[in-house]
Amino acid sequence: MAANKYTGTQTEKNLQEAFAGESQARNKYTYFASVAKKEGYEQMSALFLKTADNEKEHAKMWFKELAGISNTKENLAAAAEGENYEWTDMYESFAKTAEEEGFHELAAKFRAVGEIEKHHEERYRALLKNIETAQVFEKSEVNVWECRNCGHIVVGTKALEVCPVCNHPQSYFEVHEENY
């Protein structure tokens, strides 16, 4: 990732706090929108969502200043590292503290989320490996490929360059899975 020109400064801390605050506000407003919608306040729900979108853009602006966004390969590596920290250190530490303080159900939830974070790390590492081995759109074995835009199905070792149905590029193809 690119160097963070603010490293070690109070400005860096301010940017980190701004990013965290905007990110948390976005999530809160999304949750609030769901409540407003359930209670029959469609306009208020829409305004919470509109504001959440604004907060997302504010957070993105601060994250970019911190050099937190790179190319997909580096983003996958950073995401895997973050997920690794969450499942190996953060949630386990939180679970131990919760147990010590008598919150056993919460400790179990922390550990359960830690297991989910472990899966997230594995997913990101597998996707990173696909990029590194040039196997995102071409596999060594025959697969069923599906256009994520229109649903067109093709069987082969490689996704089509262009979908013949909707003309979307190869980037819209993924290995088709049915999990139902």
Predicted regions mapped to residue ranges:
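Non-heme di-metal
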Residues: 1-180
